[in-house]
Amino acid sequence: MSAALERLNHLNLNHLYAFVAVAEHNSFTAAAEALGLSKSLLSEQLRRLEADLGIQLLTRTTRRMTLTDRGELLFGVAQRMLGELDGALSDVRDLQGEPSGRLRITAPQDFVKWHISSVSAAFIRQFPKVQVEMLADDQFSDLVGQRIDLAVRIGWPRDSGLHASKLCDFQQVAVATPGYLAGLPPVLQPHDLARCEWIGHTRLSTPWTWTFERQRERATVQTRGRLLANNTLAVYRLVLDGAGVSVLPSFLVAREIARGRLVRLLPGWRLPQGGIYALYPSARYMPVRVRAFIESLREHLGREPFRLAQSE
């Protein structure tokens, strides 16, 4: 047996979990609480891991803790390995019964509020052995590094190296409140939007330029505005408050249009269609709980009014 295999043969996985937890939390206290261990036992497990490997993994002072170069290398490998191991073990348990274990999901704040939260509530009622942790974040997360099982992303997918499954399509819709529109001439053509006060979304590459299509016609409008936000939910609130016009996804505004709180502008024209995607690190080792949640979310979205009638 080689020296490397000999070391692996005697390696305690609990010690490796302890090391990964300390590195993830950058704190012995937080890691000990997460693992349900005392700080003294956690320190002893790390000491034994370093002794088994014959290397120093981290340095500690009274004020801070840092990983050594070898510690950084081991952390990256161990984090991925233990994540896949947890998923595989959970999958084996799932095959023997219902889905179980922790499910970490990240999605934009507006989508968590309107959809992920309600799907999660129904999901844990259906599968009581599953714990769902929702991370409302508009930034693109490192799924492997943060041990996230599933990300929901809106719009047009980027080549991130992750597996993607489209859940449904949605329309982009120009909307405003009846009160805001009451003080303006009727908006009958795309160029009429140029005289409106617009609310811009700074995360879009061109927040002020919109191209509308109708059959073979195409009209590009250059808008203007004094309000900008980097969050779809903030733009939505500004529109509802009567601050101006903006383009929002149909899944966010369909109910308000039906209730008369918002007016869809230019219903005979279309903006580019977007998609809602489920992203996950591995299709081969996907735990059953993740697969079951994706199907629950797809079923939920299939009942939602994402496609607005062209005549609205």
Curated annotation (Swiss-Prot):
Superkingdom, taxonomy of origin: Bacteria
User: Per the record, GO CC terms?
Assistant: protein-DNA complex
CDD domains the record matches: PBP2_CrgA_like (cd08422)
Q: Which Pfam families match?
A: HTH_1, LysR_substrate
What GO molecular-function term can you cite, just one?
DNA-binding transcription activator activity
| Keyword annotations | Activator, DNA-binding, Repressor, Transcription, Transcription regulation
Name of the protein described by the UniProt record: HTH-type transcriptional regulator PtxR
Q: By which gene is this protein encoded?
A: ptxR
